[in-house]
Every structure is written in C-alpha cells, then in structure tokens.
Amino acid sequence: MSTATTTVTTSDQASHPTKIYCSGLQCGRETSSQMKCPVCLKQGIVSIFCDTSCYENNYKAHKALHNAKDGLEGAYDPFPKFKYSGKVKASYPLTPRRYVPEDIPKPDWAANGLPVSEQRNDRLNNIPIYKKDQIKKIRKACMLGREVLDIAAAHVRPGITTDELDEIVHNETIKRGAYPSPLNYYNFPKSLCTSVNEVICHGVPDKTVLKEGDIVNLDVSLYYQGYHADLNETYYVGENISKEALNTTETSRECLKLAIKMCKPGTTFQELGDHIEKHATENKCSVVRTYCGHGVGEFFHCSPNIPHYAKNRTPGVMKPGMVFTIEPMINEGTWKDMTWPDDWTSTTQDGKLSAQFEHTLLVTEHGVEILTARNKKSPGGPRQRIK
C-alpha cells in the first residue's frame, strides 16, 4: 500500500531492533528479504522488497521515489500524472512504519494486514449487544482515545506536517498500552487518518504542511485490552478561516449533534440520515454517500452500517447495549467522491471542502451515552459562521 523504507529514528534504533518492511505500495509487510531496489541504492535510499515478483508488481508506483531531488528529505508527488480535484496533493516519501512494543496487545491485522476475525464476523451480519463488563472496557478505550485526540489537536497549527501529527498520535497511543487501530489495517501505513480541506476521509499522513486557513480532520482509533475506540474531529488551522470552511465544518458538527439526540431504544438507523441530510441541505451542503457509521467495540468495523444520507434503506433498530459510530461527512459542494492512487485518500470530486465529526456511542435503557465525549479542556470547538 505505502512506500516505506528501512530507515528508523535514532531513538528507535537505540531502544528497539530495526524492523524491515516491504517498500511495495500494495504490500508493506514485515520481511526478512534483502532484495534492494538498485536505482534507490544509487541515490542513497534503501528500499527493500519481499521478492522479485513484489518488486515488479509495485515498480510503477515505486519509481516515483527516484524523482525525489533530495532523497528521503525531499518532498515529492508520487502520482505526478494523477488529476487531483483540488490543491491538496500527496507529499512523499512516507516515513517508515512506526514501532509498536511487543508487549502491547494487537488486533490480528497487525501482523499481515488482514482483519480475519472482522471478516468472519461480517458473514454473520448481526449487531453485537454488549454486557456490562464489556461496556466498561469499551468505555475505558474510548476515554483513552479522547485523551490521544485532544493531545494531537493541541498541536494543530500552521507549519506542522500531518506526519508529525501521526507521530504524536502513535506515541501517545502506545504510551497508554494501546495499539493504533488504523496501523496496517488492510495495509494502511499510518496510525492516524489526516484529512485536509477537500479530503473527505482516510487521508494518509505525509509531508503535507498545514497552512493558515486550512481545516484538518484527525481520525483517532485505538485498540485497548480487546476493544476499539473510534472518534474524529475537524479543526481550524489558525484564525483566518473562510466563511465556506466555517459553514461546512459547523454544519458537520451540528449534523452529528442532532443525530446523537435521536439515539435511544426503538430509533431506526435509517432515520438518522433523513435528519442529517435535511440539516446539511438547509445549510447549502451535501452528504457523502460512500462512507458510513458502523458498529465498533470488539471489532474495528462491524454491523450496523449507518448511512448519513436521506432515504437510505439500512436495516436495524437501536437496542440497549449496542455500540456504534455516527460520523457524517459533509461537503461544501457535490457529495460525490474520488479516490487517490494510494487506494485510501478520498476527496471531493469538485475540489471543494469537506468536514467530518465522529463519536462512539452506547445505547442505554433510556437514551444514549457519548463514550468519546469532549471535556472542558478539549481543543477546538465551534466557531461562529461568517454571514
């Protein structure tokens, strides 16, 4: 999936043995191979591949690295022929996969990229109902997720790179004895999703530098003692924010808030989308249809699927003990999306802005509990629109 090298930071070298990961964009697995790209070697770059077949299958994307003027320190676009919809572009090379201590419990995809238990559960197509002892553990994971997101959000400012934010999230996650759920999930290369401006979701942290006036979504997920937490918020970068960015972001924030108010036993998952889209439309925005909320807890993603758009046909009724996310992606322009050649980054087709907010929620006997709720010290928060 990602382009990774064997380079590690000095601190990592001092405390951990170097782990080698395949540099293939569609691979990224740990390997003991010593097969190196000869072109990279001439430029002082060490890029290792699993075998000849992996090298040949990934070479078309990998060769973009050879065009970097300053080796690993020089930022470059790995997809120079790709027609981006807006100004945000991939900025490579990606930093190497970050180390997770051996003693931290890991989900099954940490080893090979495949969430086998999740795939097996998907075939059952049932919505988990969690017991009190399980809910206690999910609540703890969500509390840690909120801590990590707030720490990363406090560093959002002009001049910081999305990769630096990823490093913060990674370090704060493992400091708490948790595993960053996105890392190696279907070979996703990072511990955080960072979505800037027209990026809807699943942005890969790289050398992109945040600028005054940007908006950036930080999507944090972690795995702690067998359970996942999932939350995200969109933050303003600096103070000089356009009225379009303010309206799109605040509309998304409000859409999540009104959807949460509907959550209680007996509410259908289908009706959430009707109210979300109504509010978005009233504010001259649209709702992304490709991605949806989902069950979370024992699994990173599971039933129910929760679309955020109107007139959807998703089945299911809320019952006490259900845990899921609501995460409306609201666009300034068209609802239609497109995906970059990295097979992850989703952006608006028209290059206009997108904003998202997400909470993990527990249905109680009489309503809902926001497991990932903000606290008084949480960075960010609403701002007044500009008329």
UniProtKB/Swiss-Prot annotation:
Zn(2+) 4 binds at D230, H294, E327, E358. NCBIfam families: met_pdase_I. Changing H62R: Changes the ribosome profile distribution of the protein. It comes from the Eukaryota. Its cofactor is Zn(2+); Co(2+); Mn(2+); Fe(2+). Associates with the 60S ribosomal subunit of the 80S translational complex. This is Methionine aminopeptidase 1. Its EC number is 3.4.11.18. Belongs to the peptidase M24A family. Methionine aminopeptidase type 1 subfamily. Keywords: Acetylation, Aminopeptidase, Cytoplasm, Hydrolase, Metal-binding, Protease, Zinc, Zinc-finger.
